[in-house]
Amino acid sequence: MTPAAVHAHPALIDTSPKADSIIAASPSMIQLSFSEELIAKFSGIDLKDQAGKRVETGPASTAPKNKKQLTIPVITSLTPGTYTVEWHAVSEDTHRVKGSYSFKISQ
């Protein structure tokens, strides 16, 4: 018998801004680090303000040498308040995962 292939799902291991953090200024980008390489065109975020309104972001991308890190540019300057990052990611083996976290920009 040959061993069965192991298929893991990508796990979120780090964020920038950090989950539940309070930062002083608007971030220029959101970065998500995962345990597996991702397919950027099938991965991304919805960034929402504290009223639940979607904030404009650019397309998600990965660096050629680090496909485990997803980078999403923030197009507009964010005002003070709480923001929620609703993310979804598809790994190279096509497993899809999703989740969310929040951060706050101080007054």
Explain the meaning of each model-derived region.
Residues 6-43, 107:
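N-terminal non-catalytic regions of secreted/periplasmic and cell-surface proteins
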Residues 36, 40-107:
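Acidic, low-complexity Ser/Thr/Gly/Pro-rich repeat segments typical of extracellular/periplasmic
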